[in-house]
């Protein structure tokens, strides 16, 4: 099992698919990295030499923000919005949808499980 950016990459998958196990690398970036390093599309991870794995590591370190650094940056961006007190920050603080979705009937994922309300007693 190759270890890239602190993540164990599955050995039996194609390189493009395996790179997507790293947080911050999707299909587009995975294809870009393999082209930059010069690895064929169909090659599997267990077929890579140590030199090729090292080249992939260096390409990711140089050009992409992944894993912990990316998570930290996203968290800092959300914290900055909350500290500013802007509308988006308030929505984050109250755990409500940020991008204008309706909340009257939906948004259960963001708001959490429904709270029981006592009905009218007869």
UniProtKB/Swiss-Prot annotation:
GO cellular component: cytosol; small ribosomal subunit
Gene name for this UniProt entry: rpsM
The protein's name: Small ribosomal subunit protein uS13
Ranges for region Disordered: 97-122
Organism expressing this protein natively: Bartonella henselae (strain ATCC 49882 / DSM 28221 / CCUG 30454 / Houston 1)
GO biological process: translation
Cited function: Located at the top of the head of the 30S subunit, it contacts several helices of the 16S rRNA. In the 70S ribosome it contacts the 23S rRNA (bridge B1a) and protein L5 of the 50S subunit (bridge B1b), connecting the 2 subunits; these bridges are implicated in subunit movement. Contacts the tRNAs in the A and P-sites.
Keyword terms: Ribonucleoprotein, Ribosomal protein, RNA-binding, rRNA-binding, tRNA-binding
Keyword RNA-binding appears in the UniProt entry: yes
Pfam families named among the record's database cross-references: Ribosomal_S13
Keyword rRNA-binding in annotation: yes
GO molecular function terms noted in the UniProt entry: rRNA binding; structural constituent of ribosome; tRNA binding
InterPro entries per the UniProt record, alphabetical: Rbsml_uS13_C (IPR027437), Ribosomal_uS13 (IPR001892), Ribosomal_uS13-like_H2TH (IPR010979), Ribosomal_uS13_bac-type (IPR019980), Ribosomal_uS13_CS (IPR018269)
Family: Belongs to the universal ribosomal protein uS13 family.
Domain of life of the source: Bacteria
